[in-house]
């Protein structure tokens, strides 16, 4: 199991590339083919499933190492990756709703349609980072949680766990985990490029010309966009400090997941309105306007609570109740320790007894 764990981690990070389109239709040795190994109707679901398999490589590494640091690191990593996979999956649901497919190639093609504002063709590609900004932001945040990179590298933080779940590894298995980490970073960047940045399609305003937006040019655009996301990974590592573990988990469960659920409901409702043609019904628009005004009024007036009502009175606190000292909580008051003297008091008493010597 100890030797199998890094192999599982390495295979999981490479498998996702089989369904990521690197380019469109190209001519190769007299044959026309796509720059993609395979495309299945549930390609994005396959990517999420493979990412979940990578967690087993981390858990098995910590369990088989028989070390405290390794076990704690693997538990942290598994909890972190599972928590942020939920928010990541919810952020991708809106992409499925807009594109109408889970196929990676069809999602890229759906982003090639131009944005039309008031009947005017802007010639700007409808990339989902622009149409689905909340989903894009949530995916970028969860991307760091999935890759265990700063500011979310809590399973490997040197100040607490030495090297985390890879503390007991050396040589080739140790290098395999580092390879898996950086390949996973490239995989997440490629998925971000495919689902939100238009994939192999040329960016605006280069998409005006069909010459540089087809054939082998797609490989260049895909590579440049992926490198841009990888650069963002490196920049964040150098610019943002590490999160505390409880803050990190609160961000995932109390912020990202509720926001993702609310955003999915909003997008689904909006698409239903467009498909049913309710947007041209004045009665429907009036009802929606009244509901929005009521929500805004409730948020600014009725949603406020009295902060003083939740404050509990100060309570006495025994720091040694569990057998070892623990710090008091904000609403607890630590009782004075009987017979305890500080080092300064003892030194002053000895100084007085010796006559100032």
Give the location of each predicted region.
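Selective transmembrane helix interface/packing segments
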Residues: 1-357
């Amino acid at each position: 199991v100890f030797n199998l764990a890094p192999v599982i981690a390495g295979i999981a990070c490479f498998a996702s590339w089989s369904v990521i389109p690197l380019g469109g239709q190209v001519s190769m040795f007299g044959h026309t083919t796509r720059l993609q190994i395979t495309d299945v109707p549930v390609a994005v679901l396959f990517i999420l499933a493979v990412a979940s398999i990578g967690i087993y490589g981390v858990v098995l590494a910590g369990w088989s190492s028989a070390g405290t640091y390794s076990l704690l690191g693997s538990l942290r990593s598994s909890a972190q990756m599972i928590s942020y996979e939920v928010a990541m999956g919810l952020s991708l649901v809106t992409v499925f709703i807009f594109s109408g497919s889970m196929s990676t190639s069809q999602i890229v093609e759906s982003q090639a349609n131009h944005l039309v504002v008031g009947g005017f063709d802007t010639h700007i590609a409808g990339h989902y980072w622009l149409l689905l900004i909340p989903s894009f932001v949530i995916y970028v945040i969860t991307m760091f949680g999935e890759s265990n990179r700063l500011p979310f590298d809590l399973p490997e933080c040197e100040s607490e766990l030495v090297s985390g779940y890879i503390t007991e590894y050396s040589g080739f298995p140790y290098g395999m985990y580092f390879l898996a980490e950086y390949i996973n970073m490239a995989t997440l960047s490629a998925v971000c490029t495919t689902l939100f940045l238009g994939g192999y399609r040329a960016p605006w305003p280069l998409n005006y010309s069909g010459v540089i937006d087809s054939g082998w040019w797609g490989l260049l655009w895909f590579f440049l966009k992926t490198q841009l996301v990888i650069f963002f990974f490196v920049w964040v590592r150098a610019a943002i400090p590490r999160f505390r573990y409880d803050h990190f988990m609160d961000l995932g469960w109390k912020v990202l997941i509720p926001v993702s659920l609310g955003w999915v409901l909003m997008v689904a409702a909006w698409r239903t309105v467009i498909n049913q043609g309710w947007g041209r019904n004045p009665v429907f628009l009036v009802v929606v306007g009244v509901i929005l005004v009521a929500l805004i009024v409730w948020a600014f007036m009725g949603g406020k609570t009295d902060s003083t009502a939740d404050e509990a009175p100060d309570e006495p606190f025994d720091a040694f109740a569990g057998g070892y000292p623990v710090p008091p909580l904000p609403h607890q008051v630590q009782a004075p320790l009987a017979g305890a003297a500080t080092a300064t008091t003892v030194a002053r008493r000895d100084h007085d007894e010796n006559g100032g010597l």
